[in-house]
Each structure stands twice: as structure tokens, then as C-alpha cells.
């Protein structure tokens, strides 16, 4: 079975990139994935570039793309199709400030199994606390939570429904949360969260994990205020304590 490509987009916070790569390896079944790192012009200094190159040299990632631009959350990741070495039914997109849970079976095999069972799902991501477009729809008893849009929280994409090669310039100037999800919906596919696969996100950290001198580099984070929080049943697994996403009145 070909390895599923996991595309990690990084922007500063090297400690998060280190943790993200490490925990993917620690929490994903060996031989089932390959990691591709795409950096948004945040590794200009020699130490950071050497760190990124060492990940490649040590075999921790399959490919490395150091972009000379900061594309932010704009979805111009058409470069991904140049990075992958396999052709699989699904691929995964995430950011360096999102960390996977430790589950049995592992998170990747669970998400693939969900996609295999639900041929109508085009985008499937790990759960986060409710946020804007990611607010779920209620009333469905299923292993997924249907919603308006999902972000890059280990977002699994059905390649046949939205192949990487189909990214057009008009799609590359918009945030991925809304536009890619809407485009997938227009193609008749569902957009969902996993019901029982949650992740840890830097939004749960003060200033999203940025050092004081880095906050101003990402204007989206300057006015975010206090980090969002939710309770964990088991911090190692990042599972919810209750089904409030579906049962909230």
C-alpha cells in the first residue's frame, strides 16, 4: 500500500515544527506515510535552515520546500504535487502548530477507514473547538461531524474529488478554510470533522506559541486575545470529555 503524503506547512516556531514532525513519527503506524515540509519564508537564518535540511538528511521528511515568500494561509500550495513521491487515494495537509493524537488504531488509519466508508466525504479533518466556519451542523448520528469548512488540522483530502493538480490561480489567493471547503461542496462532496479524533492546536497557547518578537510577523494573531481551551479526557490522546459538539443547545 503506498504511503499517504502528509504536507506540513511551517511558519516560525521551530519548536513546534520539531514537535509536529516528531509526534507524527511517534503516533503514526510506520510505513504508512511520508512527510513533506513547506516553509513560508521563516527559515532565513542559517540555524533554522540547517535544522530543516537535517530533517531531510536524517530521513525524517521526504522532501523540503523553502519558499522565498510568506504566503501565510493563502492556498497556493500547488507545489505539493511536485513534492509527493506517491499516488494515493488521499493526502493530508496540516500546519506545524497542530499535533496528532496517540490512538489505537493510529489516527491516520482511523481517518482513512472513515474516508473509505464514506465515499461522499471530500474533506475530513481532526476536531477543534468550534470556530467561525468550522461550526458543526447538529442532529447527525455518525462517526463524523458535518460542518461548513475545515482548516489544516491534519485535513485529509480525497484526491479524486479535488486533486492537487486541479488547484487553479483563482483558488490560490484565498484562505483554505473557506474556499477549498466551498469548492469541495460545489463538487457535491461533504466536509467533515472526525467525531472522535481530536488534535492539539497552538491556538490553545498564549499568542499561538509565538515568541514576543514573532507575534507581529503574523498580524492575524496580534488581537486573538486569550487562547481557546477545552477539557481533555486524556491529554496524551486529546479526546473530548463529552459530546457537547453535537448536543449543545
Language-model segments: residues:
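Active-site nucleotide-sugar/metal-binding loop of Leloir-type enzymes
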Residues: 77-90
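A short, glycine-/small-residue-rich helix N-cap motif at loop->alpha-helix starts
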Residues: 68-77, 172-174
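Short beta-strand-to-loop acidic/aromatic patch adjacent to the donor-nucleotide binding site
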Residues: 88-101
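C-terminal catalytic/acceptor-binding lobe
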Residues: 143-144, 149-151, 165-249
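Acidic donor-binding segment of Leloir-type glycosyltransferases
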Residues: 25-68
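Short, well-formed alpha-helical segments that are part of the catalytic scaffolds
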Residues: 13-26
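Cell-envelope/extracellular polymer assembly enzymes that use nucleotide-activated donors
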Residues: 3-5, 179
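Conserved catalytic core of nucleotide-sugar-dependent glycosyltransferases
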Residues: 72-74, 99-169
Amino acid at each position: 500500500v503506498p504511503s499517504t503524503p502528509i504536507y506540513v506547512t511551517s511558519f516560525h516556531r521551530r519548536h513546534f515544527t520539531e514537535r509536529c514532525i516528531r509526534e507524527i513519527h511517534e503516533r503514526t503506524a510506520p510505513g504508512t506515510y511520508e512527510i513533506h515540509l513547506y516553509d513560508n519564508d521563516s527559515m532565513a537564518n542559517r540555524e533554522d535552515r540547517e535544522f530543516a535540511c537535517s530533517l531531510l538528511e536524517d530521513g525524517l521528511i521526504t522532501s523540503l520546500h523553502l519558499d522565498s515568500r510568506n504566503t501565510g494561509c493563502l492556498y497556493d500550495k500547488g507545489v505539493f504535487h511536485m513534492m509527493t513521491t506517491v499516488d494515493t487515494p488521499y493526502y493530508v495537509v496540516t500546519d506545524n502548530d497542530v499535533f496528532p493524537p496517540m490512538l489505537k488504531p493510529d489516527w491516520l488509519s482511523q481517518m482513512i477507514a472513515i474516508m473509505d466508508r464514506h465515499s461522499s466525504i471530500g474533506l475530513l479533518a481532526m476536531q477543534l473547538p468550534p470556530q467561525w466556519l468550522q461550526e458543526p451542523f447538529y442532529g447527525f448520528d455518525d462517526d463524523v461531524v458535518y460542518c461548513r469548512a475545515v482548516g489544516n488540522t491534519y485535513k485529509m483530502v480525497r484526491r479524486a474529488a479535488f486533486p492537487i493538480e486541479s488547484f487553479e490561480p483563482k483558488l490560490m489567493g484565498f484562505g483554505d478554510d473557506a474556499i477549498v471547503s466551498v469548492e469541495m461542496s460545489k463538487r457535491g462532496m461533504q466536509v467533515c470533522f472526525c467525531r472522535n479524533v481530536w488534535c492539539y492546536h497552538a491556538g490553545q497557547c498564549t499568542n499561538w506559541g509565538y515568541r514576543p518578537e514573532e507575534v507581529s510577523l503574523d498580524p492575524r494573531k496580534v488581537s486573538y486575545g486569550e487562547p481557546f481551551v477545552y477539557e481533555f479526557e486524556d491529554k496524551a490522546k486529546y479526546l473530548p470529555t463529552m459530546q457537547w459538539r453535537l448536543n449543545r443547545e
